[in-house]
Amino acid sequence: MRALLLLLLVSLATLLCAQETPAGEGSALSFSRSVNVPLNGVQLYDKALDAWNWTFGREPGAKLLQSKREDGTLDGFARFNFRSAMLTMREESMGTVQYKVVIRIVPGECRVLVTELVHSGNASTSLGGVHIGPISRGKDPLSRTPGLSRSNAQRLLAELQERSIQRVEALLNGFEARLRASAEP
């Protein structure tokens, strides 16, 4: 009888244990790129600053917050405009996706990290804006989205993920191409 009770207690305890979320399910969407160019740190910094001006610097609201040549750091942010193809809450979700760009330069290598992608909807509509907030890698938004059902929030997040990947990958490809082209003799 004791053995049966102990077995029941152990099986109940394993059923009640919290399950871990799959890796990457709730994590924020981010991008990184490492570009190897045969230049010293100062030359590479100048080329990276030029590549910033031709790519991320041309985005709406782009601003370089920190630019330290001696440390080889460039920190800034920019945004791109977003308009959903979904008919539900299209005007309310129309807005911007703002993101942070961190560039670290060491001799021979330039690392670019794009993080903190955050969607802000159109707050000037009669119903107020629909804000997804931080864009995650998972299927569900990180927090509940007021004004949208779960399925519509998932579709809007999927569209934001797709557009963010397209836009940021295009900017990273342009940055790398500009950096490599300007480094050639």
Where are the language model's segments positioned?
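Positively charged n-region of N-terminal signal peptides that target proteins for export
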Residues: 1-4
